[in-house]
Curated annotation (Swiss-Prot):
Name this polypeptide is given: Probable flavin-containing monoamine oxidase C
Record-listed E.C. numbers: 1.4.3.4
UniProt record similarity statement: Belongs to the flavin monoamine oxidase family.
UniProt-listed PANTHER family: AMINE OXIDASE, FLAVIN-CONTAINING MONOAMINE OXIDASE B-RELATED
Highest taxon, organism lineage: Eukaryota
Keyword Oxidoreductase: yes
Catalytic activity: a secondary aliphatic amine + O2 + H2O = a primary amine + an aldehyde + H2O2
Cofactor(s) this protein cannot do without: FAD
GO molecular function, one term: monoamine oxidase activity
Signal peptide: none
S-8alpha-FAD cysteine modification, residue list: 402
Amino acid sequence: MEIIYDTIIIGGGMSGLKTAYDLKKSNFKILVLEARNRFGGRTDSIKIGDGWVDAGGQWLGKKNPNLKQLCNELKLETYKQFYQGKTVFDIYDDGLIKSFDESSPNFDLCEIGLGYINPIIQTIKEVGKNIDFSKCSKESPIMLSLEKLTVSEWLRVCGYGESVKFFIWFCKMSVASSSDDISILFFFKYINSINGIESLFISDDDCTESDRIIGGSSMVSERIVSFLKDDCKLNCEVTLIDQISHKNGRLVKITTSKNEIYYCRNVVSTIPPMLLKNVIFKPDLPIEKQRLKNEMEMGNTIKVIVIYDSVFWRDQGYNGKSQSFVGPIYQSFDNCTNDLSVKSIIGFINGKEEIKYWYSKSLEERRSAVLNQYSKYWGPKALNPIHYIERNWSLDKYSAGCFMGVCKSGDIISQCNNYYTQPHGNIHWAGTETSTQWYGHMEGAITSSKRVVNEILKTSLKSKSKL
């Protein structure tokens, strides 16, 4: 006898699990199908002794109310990211390496030699606030003109050519793609979603990396899975979503790569747009949604975690954060657990060309380059870690990269943006790429689940009213 679910959620990352969590609390018969052999999606906490390191998404801030509320509900505690001390800046044409205390009341962009980007920040604010991404129009002159330009091209057109080097770095750090590869309209969309540009560069209590979850960000998924129990399955890669073949036309038939078949009334897909090309849809997706799956790309990042037996950088008055135009690590952070059971620094190698270059090297060559870079910042103790861990998210079959899906120059946002979330029959869409708030962040994933749950609840009420 066929089991008919109210809703099947495809994807067991944060957005999928939170969607399932809320629907189950509303007495829906739900099932989560996750393609991987683990839950968590683009979050992945690795146990190290009595502690952990996060190989995926790990930060939240005070401007992330939905994620903070969920942590409270799941009885998860957070702690402050360590920023006490000096930040290293390796961003100067003369090769000098300087350090500044970002918590100083006198600290600003001028002090570190980046005063020239202040006018650009103001321009970005002025232009960005005039774009309403919730009401994209295919005829919008400002959208069409901006989307044809990359970030680098727009800077040159506006007379800010001297800032291109900074924004090549900045885009790699914020969206894991070069400013030569993404449209300025997409950049505005991202900046608007996180409430401004400054919090991505200067670290304080208002920044995007202000707090962490004790036990690791995967604890969110673990707690939800323990609530869902048998209502979630691993190793279930969905290959077909069929809305037309079942004898009862209101049901959706879902088939996995193992030829397992499930039936439901509604589907929530949290698959990133660019990975939808691996799924057959009957009937096919509208042309705009097809463009999203075919033309969007994922950012590229290698997350490097170096574990030490002491916090020698803190002992010297540094906070473990570095900003570098040189690399291979373009940005690093203190990555210690709250109880110092694991003492580590994380760093990021971001961007398509950077990943291509560094993955042409051996693991030992990458390791040596990273440790030598750290030794220039914090001394010879950086050369002797007890563990060196890499996670190249571009090699992850079910993510195809990190941090988020990005858009090239062209017209995909102006023509297709409204189709990110528009249901296709009984298929609804969630995931951080569908969120207008905190796009690409864990908060964006949770926000998207809130929206899609409301959609499902309204659909359910309408269905009942017809009976």
